[in-house]
Amino acid sequence: MIEVGSLLRMWGNHSRWIALDIIADQVLVVSQKRNNKVWLNKSAFEVIG
């Protein structure tokens, strides 16, 4: 289950993200590598920490 502050890995390219906010089936995430923020669907991620 994704919660604010969760460390996430994107399915497919395995990039790492941190969850900042959650609304319905969308999650605001920030990339650890490039520091960019974007709203994406929760199903694009798996929780790794």
What do these predicted regions represent?
Residues 4-49:
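Basic/aromatic-rich interaction segments and small domains that mediate binding to polyanionic partners
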